[in-house]
């Protein structure tokens, strides 16, 4: 008897993810350039973002995470949604896959000029900020000032959590 890998099944968004995609589409169509997905840990925010990028047709995406292991894990999740339909690459930790359609990197890596300046300001249609409650930190601010994507998408389970590097900002 032949065993079929679960990976071969076409992934479909769950009800929370479908609602998120619908709401994000409305936000984008209204002309907004920033959106925030707030959902508890383990509810599928990463997959929700991948399904949204696919459904909304974003061609060039930068996904920023807080730790290198998350960059690799997130890339694998996106590969499950997209298959081979877009190229995906890592930047940082010895990886220099700058030309991929979808880039996964830590904010600390992109904060360094040798990586940041590989990209024009409008290089990405969407930039996704995982753990968006860290956005007030200087490392995020430098990256955010460099880019002008059509959409900034923040994701967090804890929107009220404060970053240690906030320097008194609210």
What do these predicted regions represent?
Residues 1-43, 47-60, 76, 80, ...:
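ATP-dependent helicase/translocase motor core
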Residues 34, 59-60, 85-87, 125-126, ...:
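Residues that mark the start of a beta-strand
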Residues 42, 66, 157:
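Conserved H-loop
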Residues 58-61, 68-94:
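Conserved helix-turn-beta segment of the N-terminal RecA-like "Helicase ATP-binding" lobe
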Residues 63-64, 154:
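Structural beta-sheet core signal
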Residues 71, 110-113, 129-136, 161-162:
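Catalytic P-loop NTPase motifs of RecA-like helicase/translocase cores
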Residues 93-126, 137-142:
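Conserved helix/coil segment N-terminal to the catalytic DExD/H
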Residues 125, 133-170:
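Post-DEXD/H (motif II) to motif III coupling segment of the RecA-like Helicase ATP-binding lobe
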């Amino acid at each position: 008897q032949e065993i079929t890998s679960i990976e071969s099944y076409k992934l479909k968004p769950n009800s929370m993810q479908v609602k998120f995609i619908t709401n994000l589409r409305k936000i984008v169509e209204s002309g907004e350039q920033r959106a925030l997905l707030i959902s508890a840990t383990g509810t599928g925010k990463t997959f929700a973002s991948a399904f949204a990028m696919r459904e909304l047709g974003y061609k060039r995406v930068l996904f920023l995470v807080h730790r290198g292991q998350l960059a690799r894990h997130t890339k694998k999740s996106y590969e499950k949604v997209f298959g081979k339909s877009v190229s995906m690459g890592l930047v940082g930790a010895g990886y220099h896959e700058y030309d991929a359609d979808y880039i996964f990197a830590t904010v600390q890596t992109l904060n360094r000029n040798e990586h940041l300046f590989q990209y024009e300001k409008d290089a990405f249609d969407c930039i996704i900020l995982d753990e968006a409650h860290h956005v007030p930190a200087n490392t995020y601010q430098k990256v955010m000032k460099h880019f002008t994507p059509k959409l900034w998408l923040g994701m967090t389970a804890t929107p009220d959590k404060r970053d240690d590097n906030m320097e008194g900002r609210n």
